[in-house]
A protein has these predicted regions:
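Membrane-integral, polyisoprenol-dependent glycosyltransferases
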Residues: 1-361, 552
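Membrane-embedded architecture of ER/inner-membrane glycosylation machinery
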Residues: 163, 284-564
C-alpha cells in the first residue's frame, strides 16, 4: 500500500512538472486558442455565463463547460491569461492520467499502469492537447473517466447508479455536444453484450444513464435557446448533426478515411518509432490458415481475452471507427483512444524489455541523439554559426525571425536547469547501457523523452512561437486606441465559419467588432493592405488614413465617412 502511494505521488509530480510549469510561456499564435479564451473573457466582463457574445457578433460554437472552467481559473487572478486559459486542459490531462493509473493498477498491475500513464503523458498529440486552450482535452478526459466508471458499474452487473459516470457524461455533453455522452455508453454496452449480458437489460440500463446525463445539458440548451433563438438552434444543428452527415454549410476539416490512421501514428511520436524498430526484432511465422479460420480464431481469442484488455480494445476500435464515418476529421477527435493504446503499448514495452532489450537500447540511443542534437543546434544558433542565407523561398523571412528569436533568448536559471536536465537524462541512459541488468532501461528512456518535452515547452518553443503571435500588434494598437471599439475588415467571409481577428481581439479585451455589423461613421479599423484596398473601392465615401504601428501585415487605419 505504501509503495503504491509513493508511485501515485511520483506520477502526480511528473504530471505537474510536465504540464503546469510553462503553460503561459507561449503567446496565442493560432486562431483556435484565443477563440475559446475570449468566450471566457466575455463571460467575466459581461456577466453572461449562458450564451455570451464575443467578437461583437459571435456566440460560442461549443457548449460552455470548457469556457466556464477557464473563467473560474481566471477569476482567481482577476483576468484571462494564456496560463489560465490552458489550465483546464492541463488539469483534465492530469486527472485522466491519474485515474487511468488507478484503474489499470487495480486490474493489470502497478508496473504496466505506471508505464501506461507515462506513455499517455509523453506522446506528442496528448501532450500538445494538454497544454492548449482547446475543448478537446477536457472532452477526452471526461469521456475516458466515464468509460472507467461505466466499466466499474459493469463489474457490479449494473447494480446501483453510476453517479460519477453520469456527471462525467454530462460534462462531456456540455463540452462538445452529445457525442461525448453517446460514445462511452456505446463502448460499454457492446462490451457487456459480448460478455453475454441480456441485450434488453443493457439497453434500458444505458438508456437510463443517457437520460440522466442529459438533464444538466438540457437545462443549458433551454436557457441558451431563450437567449440565442433560431441562430443558436441552427448552430447546434450545424455542429452536431450536419457535421456528422457531411452536410455543413462550409467545408470543415474534410479528410479521407486513412487520415485517422496517419494522425494516430504521427500523434504517438516518439513511440511510433519504437514500434517500428521492434518489428525487425520479432519472429514471424508463415500464415497458413484460411480467412474463415482466422475469423474463428479471432472469436475464440476474444472470448478468452481478459475483461480489461477486451474493454480497452473495444474502446479503441469503436471510437476510431465512429470518427472514420463523418467527412470532418481531426487528429484531436481521436484523443479518447490514446490512453487505451498506451495500455497495450505498455504491455508491449515491458515484453520488449524482457525479451528484446536491444530494441529499447536502440530507441533510447536515438532519443538521446535527438536530445544532444537539439542542444547542439541551439548553441550553434546562439554562437551565430548559422548564417541567414541558409533560408530561402517563400518563408525565408519568417524562418530567419525564428532563428534570431532563439539566438537572442536570454538564458536564466530555469533555462540552464532545463539544459542540465537533458544532459543528466542522456547520462543516465548511457550508464544504463553499461549495466547487465536492463530491466529498468525503459524508465531512462522515458526520462529522456520527458526532458525533451520539458525543454521544448520551457526553452525552445516559446521564442519561436511568439514570433508568430499578433500580441505585439495588439499592444501597439492598445497604446493608440486605449478604449472603445476597434473595427475589423476581412475578405472571403464564409457563412457559418466567419473570419475574425481572434488573437488581436483577445489581447485588446474583446473590443474588435466586424465593420459590416455596425457600419460606423468614424473610428479605427484593422485590416491588411490588400483588404483596405478593397474597402476603399467598396466604400468610396470613407476617408482612410493609416496609423503607423510597426512593420506588420496587419495595419491600423483611422476612417471617417464623408458627410458632404
Amino acid at each position: 500500500m505504501q509503495k503504491n502511494r509513493n508511485v501515485v505521488w511520483i506520477l502526480a509530480g511528473i504530471c505537474i512538472c510536465s504540464l503546469f510549469l510553462f503553460l503561459g510561456e507561449s503567446y496565442f499564435h493560432t486562431k483556435g486558442e484565443p477563440r475559446e479564451a475570449v468566450v471566457a473573457l466575455a463571460m467575466l466582463e459581461k456577466g453572461n455565463w449562458i450564451l455570451p457574445v464575443n467578437n461583437g457578433v459571435d456566440i460560442a460554437y461549443k457548449p460552455p463547460l470548457f469556457h466556464w472552467c477557464i473563467a473560474v481559473c481566471s477569476a482567481v487572478i482577476g483576468t484571462v491569461t494564456e496560463y489560465t486559459s490552458r489550465m483546464p486542459s492541463a488539469i483534465a490531462l492530469m486527472a485522466m492520467v491519474m485515474v487511468g493509473y488507478a484503474f489499470f493498477a487495480k486490474r493489470r498491475g502497478r508496473e504496466v499502469a505506471f508505464v501506461m500513464a507515462l506513455l499517455t503523458l509523453t506522446n506528442f498529440e496528448v501532450h500538445r492537447a494538454g497544454t492548449n486552450c482547446r475543448v478537446d482535452m477536457l472532452l477526452s478526459a471526461l469521456m475516458v473517466i466515464a468509460l472507467y466508471q461505466l466499466y466499474k458499474w459493469g463489474e457490479k452487473r449494473l447494480r446501483g447508479i453510476p453517479w460519477i459516470a453520469i456527471l462525467c457524461l454530462s460534462g462531456a455533453f456540455l463540452t462538445k455536444g452529445p457525442v461525448g455522452m453517446v460514445l462511452p455508453c456505446l463502448v460499454m454496452a457492446v462490451f457487456l453484450w459480448i460478455r453475454g449480458m441480456n441485450f434488453w437489460r443493457i439497453f434500458f440500463s444505458f438508456f437510463g444513464v443517457a437520460l440522466a446525463s442529459c438533464v444538466l445539458p438540457f437545462a443549458w440548451y433551454v436557457a441558451a435557446y431563450r437567449q440565442g433563438g433560431e441562430e443558436f438552434l441552427q448552430l447546434v444543428l450545424e455542429e452536431n448533426v450536419l457535421r456528422f452527415l457531411g452536410k455543413m454549410s462550409y467545408e470543415s476539416h474534410e479528410n479521407p478515411a486513412y487520415y485517422n490512421v496517419v494522425t494516430v501514428l504521427a500523434g504517438y511520436v516518439p513511440y511510433t518509432l519504437l514500434v517500428l524498430i521492434s518489428l525487425f526484432a520479432l519472429k514471424y511465422r508463415k500464415v497458413q490458415a484460411k480467412p474463415r479460420e482466422w475469423w474463428g480464431r479471432l472469436k475464440a481469442y476474444i472470448r478468452t481475452m481478459d475483461d480489461t484488455r477486451l474493454f480497452s480494445l473495444l474502446s479503441i476500435v469503436i471510437i476510431f471507427v465512429f470518427y472514420c464515418i463523418p467527412k470532418s476529421k481531426r487528429s484531436v477527435y481521436l484523443l479518447p483512444i490514446y490512453p487505451f493504446i498506451a495500455y497495450f503499448l505498455a504491455e508491449y514495452i515491458l515484453y520488449l524489455v524482457r525479451v528484446h532489450p536491444v530494441v529499447m537500447k536502440i530507441f533510447g540511443s536515438i532519443m538521446a541523439s535527438v536530445s544532444i542534437l537539439l542542444l547542439l543546434v541551439f548553441f550553434s544558433l546562439r554562437m551565430g554559426w548559422v548564417p541567414d542565407t541558409i533560408f530561402s523561398g517563400r518563408h525565408a523571412e519568417e524562418n530567419r525571425a525564428f532563428m534570431h528569436a532563439l539566438e537572442t533568448v536570454p538564458l536564466d536559471v530555469v533555462s540552464w536547469f532545463l539544459i542540465g536536465a537533458m544532459l543528466v537524462a542522456v547520462k543516465c541512459f548511457i550508464s544504463s547501457l553499461r549495466k547487465k541488468d536492463v530491466r529498468m532501461i525503459h524508465y531512462d528512456v522515458f526520462f529522456i523523452v520527458f526532458t525533451i518535452f520539458l525543454s521544448l515547452d520551457g526553452l525552445f518553443q516559446p521564442p519561436v512561437l511568439n514570433v508568430k503571435s499578433q500580441k505585439p500588434i495588439a499592444e501597439s494598437i492598445a497604446r493608440i486606441v486605449p478604449q472603445g471599439t476597434v473595427y475589423s475588415y476581412q475578405l472571403n467571409e464564409v457563412k457559418g465559419n466567419p473570419l475574425r481577428q481572434f488573437i488581436v481581439n483577445f489581447y485588446l479585451g474583446d473590443r474588435v467588432v466586424p465593420f459590416y455589423a455596425v457600419s460606423p461613421v468614424q473610428g479605427y479599423m484593422v485590416a491588411e493592405e490588400v483588404e483596405i484596398a478593397v474597402f476603399k473601392e467598396e466604400h468610396p465615401d470613407y476617408r482612410v488614413e493609416e496609423i503607423p504601428i510597426g512593420d506588420y501585415r496587419l495595419r491600423l487605419y483611422q476612417f471617417k465617412k464623408n458627410t458632404e
